[in-house]
C-alpha cells in the first residue's frame, strides 16, 4: 500500500509500507527461494521501521514513476473493425492544438442558429476537450469505494466505509449546468450491515439502491422522497433452492437495465440472480468460476447476456435464454490474463467488452471470438503459478509475457492494479465510446484512446488508490473516489492543459492542486495602508524650520 502524503498516517499504513520496502531486499538475499507468506519468520520480524519523512518520500517516488502506456494488438481484424466503428461515431482523431480548439469552438458558435450538431460532431468536440482539472466536492476520513452517476447525470452516488465501522451512501443531488459541481449533498445511512459494503449499485432511474456485504447479504433500498433522507431497506431472501450453508462475501452487484433483476458474484465461486420486485433468488450458478467472482454485469440493454469475471483469470458469458432448458453452462469463455480479473464492463453494443486484471493489463474482447480450451488451460496454469498478494505486495516481473491462446482484441498497459479491485470502463456514448478509463493504485485516473492505443489523459490528484471513477453520460465530466476519502469531479479547463500531459511530454509543466478555475480563485487582499504618525510625533523628531536656535548668529 502506498503511504499517504501526510505525516499523520496510521501505524498500520506505516507497517504495510515498510513490508513493501523489505520485499526487494528479501528477494536479493535469496532470489531462488523467496517466500512471502505470513508465517515467514524473516518477513514478520525483519521489516525496518519507517519514519514519517521516509514514508512521504516513498509515496512521492512511487507517484512519479513514469508510465508511458503501451498497446498490444492481438486480433488485427477485430481491432480494425472496432476503430472503424469509433471513427464512424466520432470522426477522426481529436486534435489538442489551440488553433484546432478555437476553430471547433467558432464553428460551434456559428451553428447555434443553424442545424443541430450531429452526434459525431458533438463527440468530436467533446473528445477534443477531455477532463483535465479537478474540483474536490467531498472529503471524509474513511475509504471511498464506489461512484456512479444516475438520472442522466443529475445526481451521483458515492459509497464509503463509515466513520465508526458503519457504512453509508453519500448522495449529491442538484441540477448540473455547464458541468458545474453538484450543489447540495446529503448523507444517507445504510440499513443493517455486516462489517462493510463491498459494492453499491443504483438503477438508471435513480430510485433503487442495492449494496452487498462481507456476509451473504444483499439489501435493496427504495428512495421514496426527493431529498433521499428516508430510505426503506429490504433484505433479499438469500435462502432458496440452493441455500448457502457457510457465510460468504458478496463482491459485486448490478441492476438490469429494466431494474427487474440484480445479479451478484460471491466468494463461493457462484453467481446469483434475484428478482427485485419479489426480493427472492430466481437462479444460482454454482461453481461458475474456480475462484472468487469479482465482477458481473449485464451485457446489453435486453439483459439476456451476463458477463462474469473472477480470480481464476477467466471471463465467462452466460445466456439467460438457455436457462429455461436447465442449461447453466457458459456460452463462451475468454482467456488470456495471467492473474485474476478485477472488473468486467460491456460496451453496450452486443459485441465488445473489457476486463481489468491484477496482471496490470486491460484486455478488450470480441464476443464473436471465444477462446479455445487450450487457451483456458494456459490461463489456468498461469494464474495458479502466481504466489503474490496484490493487496500489499508489488506486482512481480513476468506479468507482461503473453499467454498462449489469448484471443483478446487488444491489451492496454499503463496503470497499476493493487490493494483493491480497481475498475475500468468504456467511455459513454456521447464520446463515441472511444476511450477506456480506469482507476489506478497511484492515485490517478488513466484514460486510454482505443484508436491510437495511447494514454490520452492521466489525471493526478489523489493520495491513495482510486478504486472507481464514472464518466458523466452527457458532459465531459468524471467523478473519482479514492481511499484517501476524497471525492473529486474532473472537468475541462483550457488553462490547465499542462497538468494532464504524459510524463514524458517535453513541454510538461505543473500547476497547483486546484488553481486556474474562477470559482477557486482566492480574493486579492488589499494592501494595508501605512499609518501616518501624528503631527506632534513628527514635530518631535524633526524640528520645524520656523524655530531658530538661541545661538543663531548672523
Swiss-Prot record:
UniProt KW Membrane keyword: no
Any Pfam family the entry gives: WD40
WD repeats by residue range: 245-284, 288-328, 336-375, 414-458, 461-500
Entry's Gene Ontology cellular component terms: Cul4-RING E3 ubiquitin ligase complex
InterPro entries xref list: DCAF, DCAF11/LEC14B, WD40/YVTN_repeat-like_dom_sf, WD40_repeat_dom_sf, WD40_rpt
Keyword Repeat: yes
Protein keywords: Repeat, WD repeat
Disordered: annotated segments: 24-52, 527-554
GO biological process, one term: proteasome-mediated ubiquitin-dependent protein catabolic process
Acidic residues composition bias: residue spans: 33-43
PANTHER family: DDB1- AND CUL4-ASSOCIATED FACTOR 11
Family affiliation: Belongs to the WD repeat LEC14B family.
Function: Involved in regulation of lifespan. Required for dopaminergic CEP neuron degeneration in response to Mn(2+).
Protein name: DDB1- and CUL4-associated factor 11 homolog
Gene transcribed to yield this protein: wdr-23
